[in-house]
Structure formats: structure tokens, C-alpha cells
A protein has these predicted regions:
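Enzymes that bind and transform nitrogen-containing heteroaromatic metabolites
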Residues: 1-180
Length: 180
């Protein structure tokens, strides 16, 4: 899936929790380099994180924090492009982020995030397609893929398909409610 996207979007919570690389490991040639995009209102991104250590003009961070701080300058020297963004209630304005990505000719965005950012995108009706993976575990951590998951009932899905990929279950579906 990462191979098919122009950009991969995540929140700082995912970066802090998992320290991922967020790269396309398909081994296939790409039309353009995968742009890794992080929403980080307070600029909590560590210069020591794997994603920063592998930054090579492919890491874009939207933040409401000052771009003149020593930490911001250190991240910029490491190859991170910082973009000042509006924040409401401590969260980066997702609609404004997508507009900026569109200005950069980013046409497809893969959202790989935690429940808060997933829930925000869901509530704003910014999701075209859902692809959810479930691992076959009897007991889990009780986390849900979307914050405010009860509101999913107001967003019915259609064309639901499920298939097994290795040991995991992959569910694909499309929102029935038209996007804004």
C-alpha cells in the first residue's frame, strides 16, 4: 500500500510510540519518492528518531511550534522540512495539511496513524477508503483504531471485503457518506 501512495501521513504519537521508518519497502521503482508526513503540533519529534536519521528531502513535519527554536533548526539541518500550520485545540488543522499537500502535487495519501488522528480524519470525512488489519489474537490491548469509535455508526460502509494476508485479516471498505 505504501508503494501506491504519494505520501504517508501519521501523527507524532505513532512516531513516539513505535519509532518507525515509514518507508516503501516494496523494492519496486517509484514515480516519485514517498513523502513521509508527520503532524506534530508541539514539535516533539526527536532528532534521534529513525525517521529523522533517514530524512533525505522526504520528511515533512507540520507544526504549530516556532520554526526558530534550536530544536527546529537541528531538525532542519538533519533534512526535515518544517511547515508552520494552524492548530485548533492542540491539533494541526488536517484540512489545511491536505490543501498544502495538494499544492505539492501529492495526489494520494496513506493515513497510517493512531486512533486520535484516524478519528479526526473520519469525523472530517477525509477518508476515501478504509483498509484495516487485524491480527488473530485472543486478547489485545483494548485499543480501537479510531478515537470516538461510537461515531462510526454514523458513517456506514459499503463494498466491504475481507481477506486473509498471512496470519492477519485485511478488511477493505468504502464510506457510504459522500465526502465533503
Amino acid at each position: 500500500m505504501r508503494h501506491a501512495a504519494d505520501a504517508l501521513l501519521t501523527g507524532i504519537g505513532t512516531i513516539v510510540a513505535d519509532n518507525p521508518l515509514l518507508t516503501d519497502r516494496s523494492g519496486r521503482s517509484r514515480r516519485r519518492r514517498l513523502l513521509r508526513v508527520i503532524l506534530d503540533s508541539q514539535l516533539r519529534l526527536s532528532p534521534q528518531s529513525q525517521i529523522v536519521k533517514t530524512a533525505d528531502d522526504d520528511l515533512l513535519v507540520f507544526t504549530a511550534a516556532s520554526l526558530d527554536s534550536p530544536k527546529a533548526r537541528k531538525l532542519q539541518r538533519a533534512g526535515v522540512e518544517l511547515v508552520r500550520a494552524r492548530a485548533r485545540g492542540g491539533r494541526i488543522d488536517l484540512q489545511a495539511v491536505l490543501i498544502e499537500l495538494g499544492r505539492r502535487d501529492i495526489l494520494s495519501v496513506l493515513l497510517e496513524a493512531g486512533p486520535t488522528l484516524n478519528g479526526t480524519a473520519l469525523e472530517a470525512r477525509l477518508i476515501d477508503k478504509f483498509v484495516l488489519f487485524y491480527s488473530p489474537k485472543i486478547a489485545g490491548d483494548g485499543k480501537v483504531p479510531f478515537a470516538h469509535a461510537r461515531r462510526l455508526n454514523r458513517n456506514p460502509l459499503e463494498r466491504v471485503q475481507a481477506r486473509q494476508i498471512g496470519p492477519d485479516l485485511c478488511v477493505e471498505a468504502y464510506p457510504l457518506t459522500p465526502r465533503r
